[in-house]
Amino acid sequence: MSEDLVQQQGTPLGRYEYLRLGATTLSQLARASIIKGGLDDADRQRKPDGLILLPKGGVKAVIEIKQPQELTAAKIPSVIKVYCPIARAISGCNVIIFTDGQKSLWVNPHTENIIQYNGKSVTTVFDPKAVVAQALSPEEIRELNDLVEMADQTISATNDALHSAPILDPTPLAERVWQKIWVTTGKEPEKCLYNVVEIFVFKFLSDIGVLTGTYSFGQIVRQTKHGNDIALDHYASIVRPQIRKLFPKGPDGTTIINGTIFVNEKGEANHSQSSLFTQVLQDFQDFDDENGSMKNIDRQFKTRLFESFLRQSAGIKSLGQYFTPRNVVQTMVRMSGAEKLPKGARIADPFCGVGGFVLETIAEFPSIQNQFVPKNKRIKPDYHFRGYDKGSDEKDDERTIILAKANMLIYLSELLSRYNDADYLKEFADSVFNETFHLLRSNLGTFGLVDEEPFDLILTNPPYVTSGSAALRQSIRDNALDDYYANAGRGTEALAMEWIISNLKPGGRALVVVPDGLMNQRKVIEQIKERCIVDSISALPSRTFFSTPKKTYILEVTKKTDEFEKQTTPVLAYVITEIGESRDARRIPIQQNDLLDLERAHRYFMVDKDGYVPSDPRARVISWDDFDGLTQWLIERQWSVEDRKTLNLLEERSEVDEEGFLQMVSSTLEDLQEYISEVRNEQA
């Protein structure tokens, strides 16, 4: 190994590091695994003055240090011709920087042309002495990092112009890392995902310049050279406390991270997983080496990250918390008209899980997302968003709301990339993440919130398990809330519907995913008609939620402004066969997406309820007199068997395993017991 490599350690330069050389050949660099790929014989003895590289990753730029007299206009062409072969010889290197410390030229080694950005030659100064002395400002480091990354991702043998790095979809990385953690540890799938998300947040915050120096992702990667335990100790004792400091806990005690595979419940390093931790870091670094930083994240990754991994989780399934497919969420959001609400409007998901309805509402409408742009270092959105989830003092119960907050960070990644000093981050934590999502530490969860200020819009998919609802009702009685839920029907979904209606403002709207069991309960139906205007009911196909074959519906209501108001307007009924993705374990995109046609029919209907005549065979406008006479709201039955066959609406028989069958029997038994109890109470 050369004396350079023995004596020199790389100098941190944002997410990269600078390696000062001079006497080291490319051949020696290859033997030290600093450069990858083969070398031609003619290139082996070439000696770069310095390199910019990812720690334990690839070389991104070659540095050539010259005297000022060597960088005159007359001599630059010959200097470029002589030294560009050094950078060309290094696989993946797309830029060579010539510098005298005061003046610099950024050159494409493949074409030997000066690199252009916004129509001008790139001459941003790279001063090796200032880099080694770590005398650069954060702004200067960020500018150099941005230029190096753009060159890495966009410069080629056919392109000399820099442009923004491409939008990144890290789904393959997330899947690979999740699989690795799951196979290695044997932990539940959702626990594995918590740790994927935590490392993702760590990498993202490093890439946007929030975590720098000793707190950065690159620093932890460098620590792995000294041992896996040392790297994990540094992460657990130094980095995680810094993330918690930057994003303080909310009143409920939760923040944006809480993985417990790489650390224990006390936050101490779990050395039994040090090797796995190092492997995961390397996976992230390899992805960065090939694709660039996490700064520009594809929206589809944001929207489907949690759904992809948690859809089949047994732990989630047993609680009835079926993750709503994002196509369904987005359709409900677009039907809601959230962007037209007045200033000061309140929007909620009272059973929010990882926050999909709230976050998709923010992401769908630019006018709403712009409300989260800081002004004078304060964030005061015009709308007030709330997401509630049930928990306890157990660490496992905190994780869903922590995921919701981390999910919000990912959704707002573009804003965090632009506004990321400590003051801004604390404001995002206090006024956005902690203000939006709340863990309710009680057996009642949301059902215990009876004095909440009412909402203009509620979008939700409440839990709809029947098993266990008797215990929940007992808790309601124990907390003297019987009167509040006196009119609720059977099952948790009926309690949820009672809460939703009670917590809407007069004139407020709700779009709710409900199961067929609710649509069969005459008591619930009558209560909804008494207190709300029924706008639409859309029948979703079986297996919309992969975890269950249960038939579900999108119920849309508007709370009456006058309790004596009688509905006269018709109701839009819509039947859906396909939701734009296969309804099996793969959930791959498919061409047919009836949800889009539902949105179109809904737009026309809401403009002119009495005059709308649908041409879509999946849509029906049911007069109020006819609708009011229905004893159940299984609206697909408004189509004849022949019509349903034509529309491919006849459901196939669903098979369930033994556990699923026992759950169905248990739920049915509890349902019957509640029904008998209701009848006896009415007769008493």
Which residues are covered by each model-predicted region?
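Domain-level recognition of nuclease-like catalytic cores that cleave nucleotide substrates
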Residues: G101-M150
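Long recognition/docking surfaces used for binding and targeting
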Residues: V201, I208-S313
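Active-site metal-binding core of divalent-cation-utilizing nuclease and nuclease-like domains
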Residues: Q7-G57
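Conserved S-adenosyl-L-methionine
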Residues: T324-E453, L457, V465, P515-G517, ...
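Nucleic-acid nuclease catalytic cores
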Residues: T72-G119
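Conserved catalytic cores of phosphodiester-cleaving nucleases, focusing on short active-site segments
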Residues: G50-I52, V59-Q69, Y83
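Active-site-adjacent loop/helix micro-motif of nuclease/hydrolase catalytic cores
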Residues: D41-Q45, A61, Q69-I80, S582-R583
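A conserved structural/catalytic subdomain of Rossmann-like adenosyl-cofactor enzymes
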Residues: L71, V125, K129-Q134, L449-A684
